[in-house]
């Protein structure tokens, strides 16, 4: 959604494929997203958060420790666009059903930059991946802060019943969002993931995570309606989502003018 709104994040990111992968990085090695992680990394490490009922990731610490050292690459390099699920389907269909496309022009070739493993381009992708990870942590901080405030305002406190209702509401809200971009496990992305400074992510883990992303996007084209929320409200979701997007763009805009390329 940040890339689609043409704000500061969209202007800053060069490798959109890496940025989108970064958006899920905190949930990969903790074991939430990818099954059968041999040695899961504790949540307090992957999410920069204390072990509490409604944890609030310290996104600013992650920025200082991992994004700032890479900012010398900001704005450098050729753009790598994200792949939509529709384009992926068309590429696959052209392989399996070539007769359907007889007489039609070929799809544009994939730019060589998308699979490049040149050190400077991998470093650019690493910045975008790391920025995506920060965006995840910032979003979690804002969402959980607002959930905590919502609960406190109604005299409630965290409990197992609260957790179940909250998770159910978030699951349904997620299904209402129209998401069409998927991540490609390119050599460039794998190289950037293995160089992720907080903890390396192996090629196998990248492949597994991108597979999950593809399934999620395929199964959730964006629903027009949903069952009634059990804890939160439509207003809560719309207002907090807007805050997440606006805050992320605002913070990134503060470094846009300092790019070196």
For each of these PLM feature ranges, what is it?
Residues 1-261:
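N-terminal leader/auxiliary helical segments
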């Amino acid at each position: 959604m940040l890339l689609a709104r043409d704000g500061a994040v969209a202007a800053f990111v060069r490798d959109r494929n890496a940025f989108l992968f970064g958006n899920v990085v905190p949930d990969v090695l903790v074991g939430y997203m990818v099954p059968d992680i041999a040695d899961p990394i504790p949540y307090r490490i992957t999410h920069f958060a204390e072990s509490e009922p409604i944890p609030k990731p310290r996104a600013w610490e992650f920025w200082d420790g991992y994004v700032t050292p890479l900012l010398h690459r900001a704005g450098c390099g050729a753009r790598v666009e994200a792949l939509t699920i529709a384009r992926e389907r068309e590429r696959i269909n052209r392989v399996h059903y070539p007769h359907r496309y007889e007489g039609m022009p070929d799809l544009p070739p994939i730019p060589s930059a998308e699979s490049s493993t040149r050190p400077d381009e991998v470093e650019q992708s690493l910045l975008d991946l790391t920025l995506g990870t920060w965006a995840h942590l910032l979003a979690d901080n804002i969402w959980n802060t607002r959930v905590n405030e919502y609960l406190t305002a109604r005299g409630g406190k965290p409990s197992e019943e609260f957790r179940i209702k909250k998770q159910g509401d978030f699951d349904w809200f997620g299904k209402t969002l129209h998401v069409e971009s998927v991540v490609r496990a390119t050599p460039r992305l794998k190289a950037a993931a293995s160089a992720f400074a907080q903890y390396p992510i192996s090629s196998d883990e990248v492949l597994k995570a991108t597979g999950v992303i593809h399934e999620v996007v395929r199964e959730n084209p964006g629903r027009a309606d949903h069952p009634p929320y059990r804890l939160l409200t439509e207003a809560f979701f719309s207002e907090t989502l807007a805050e997440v997007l606006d805050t992320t763009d605002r913070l990134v805009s503060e470094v846009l003018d300092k790019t070196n390329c």
